Amino acid sequence: MAKQTGTRKKSSPDKSPPASPVRQKAAPETATPAPVSPLMGLPFEQPIVKLERQIQELIVLQEQKGVDYSHEIAKMRENLIGLIKKTYDNLSAWETVQVARHPNRPQTRDYIHMIIKDFEELHGDRRYGDDKAIVTGTGRIGSQKIMLIGQQKGRDTKEKIACNFGCAHPEGYRKALLKMQFAAKFGLPVVCLIDTPGAYPGLGSEERGVAEAIAVNLREMSVLPTPIICIVIGEGASGGALGIGVGDRLAMMQYAWYSVISPEGCSGILWKGSANAPDAAEALKLTSNHLRELGVIDDVIREPLGGAHRNPRAAADALERYIERSLRELKSVPIPQLLDQRYNKIRQYGVGALTAD
């Protein structure tokens, strides 16, 4: 049996991109988004990347030659904002999946650094080990103390391997449940950040009961006597997402996706290969707008122009505002009434799909 890690450890900004210790005001949506490296640009973003490169070249030329190109640069930036808006207003389901997987997209630890104060990380499930794919701990959003549960994919190669690319083992889900029960005991609301390609289906994971661990979480979260807010911040795939996805509010970031299976997995089953993943993405109705129309989710959290990967600070501010508002609403509801509402909410899943045109 693996050695159990310590139960409590101070959070440290080790792997995530550093966040400024001074809270910065988010850039307005009409401001020019931060340029994306050509190596990081998504296939459909290439016209945007090309225009960004031209703007940067003109800025360099202006500095080198001492010629005033400010009018031309301003005009190109205006065109850039229009191009980004047009592109992101017309994303296909498959393009949305690509945005959700962008390597620069904020992950759980990034949001912890940006919006959670006094975060104290809690480790281990007291049965097997400490799964790095799920981060748990206490902290504050505004003046409200919370229990944070979040899935972490990792940034660099070392962290990705440690986090198993966001694919949690059963000990990760048991760790999450243990911390949720701790939260309920001490009257702390639970905030779950979902971002996973799925629970890990390996031999060891199956031997240790990953399906049972997820099922127990579904059962226990359904009746946990404390407010629960669940937010899909990136990928929300299958039971791996459901394992921390039952609550009183279920929201999605604008360019996240949430589905019973990944587009590639669906394509492999229906078309015997991954080539039809774009068709599968459309059929799965996995985008935030589709799922809100179907009644699966409650809210969509708007992302900054060009997606969260272009302006993580603005995305974090939008997420923080949503959590604070939801906490105020849920904290005002007596626990027995809250549990009745949660039960009715769960019973309504799928009804929107039956009544949709």
Model segments located where?
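Short, motif-level signal for alpha-helix interfacial/capping segments enriched in acidic residues
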Residues: 69-72, 172-174, 266
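Intrinsically disordered, low-complexity segments enriched in small/flexible residues
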Residues: 2-145, 313-357
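Conserved catalytic cores of soluble enzyme domains
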Residues: 26, 194-324, 328, 332
